[in-house]
Amino acid sequence: LLIPYPPLEEQKVSAHILSTLDEKFEVNNQINKVLENMAQAIFKQWFVDFEFPNEDGEPYKSSGGEMVESELGMIPKGWEVKGLDEIAEFLNGLAMQKYRPTENEKSYPVLKIKELRQGRTDENSDLCSSNIEKKYIVRDGDIIFSWSGSLLVDIWCGGKCGLNQHLFKVTSDKHDQWFVYQWNKYHLDRFVNIAKSKATTMGHIKRKDLSDSKVLIPSDELYLKAAQYQKYLFEKIMYSKIEIKRLEEIRDSLLPKLMSGEIRVPLNEEGDAS
């Protein structure tokens, strides 16, 4: 059986195109890690260590900033202590097997833990009816919290999909996404330990654990100053994730077409790509 192959030079050009795409989203992944680490470091400096710049540009706590007693210990004067569930809504997803699309009905891919981990849906993702309640539809930029099994908090940038059970969509009409996201990330290690302690069942957390997880609300003035940094970083991460998804889609679409010869790379007389 003879299998036709494109000319060697054409194969090399195709391989170069695909490897360039791979390199591009690997670079984006590395940039995202740096941005995430930067955002978390700034958040910890301001909201955990209380070393945000005072009026003179000096670290607040170590420069003698006024502190008051609270249930969390000493905190900056004027700050409030609240439960994690007081700053955001945690919407649990649906048992999507009950919402399968009917024949010829528009559908959405279902967001499960697998999809959250890989950052996108794929051809193996389950489908759900597009007629589910709007609040269960996930869009780019939504904060998703896997609270059972593999605990994970991430910014979803994999396109529109349906929210499956065991996942929270975390939203707030009181605070910016960066603020809600960073506090959820801050408490994630604690949630993982709580889940691990449930040895007889699949590890998970309860809503009471959200209430017991405390957050600090600064003054409006300081909140706005922090937002100048955090909002910018949050949006950079989100847009970079969206670009990674698009690059992966281009690669996955090109690969079988280049391999099959459906798409040919034009070469000039010297055998180079034209």
Residue positions per predicted region:
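A short glycine-rich beta-alpha junction/loop motif
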Residues: 1-15, 161-168, 198-224
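Non-catalytic DNA-recognition/assembly elements of restriction-modification systems
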Residues: 2-42, 62-95, 220-266
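Extended non-membrane alpha-helical scaffolds
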Residues: 4, 29, 51, 80-83, ...
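Short coil/turn segments at secondary-structure boundaries
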Residues: 57, 62, 97-105, 194-197
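Sequence-specific dsDNA recognition surfaces
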Residues: 66-69, 85-100, 107-140, 162-163
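A short beta-sheet element
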Residues: 112-113, 131-189, 195-200, 206-210
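C-terminal, helix-dominated tail/subdomain
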Residues: 265, 272-274
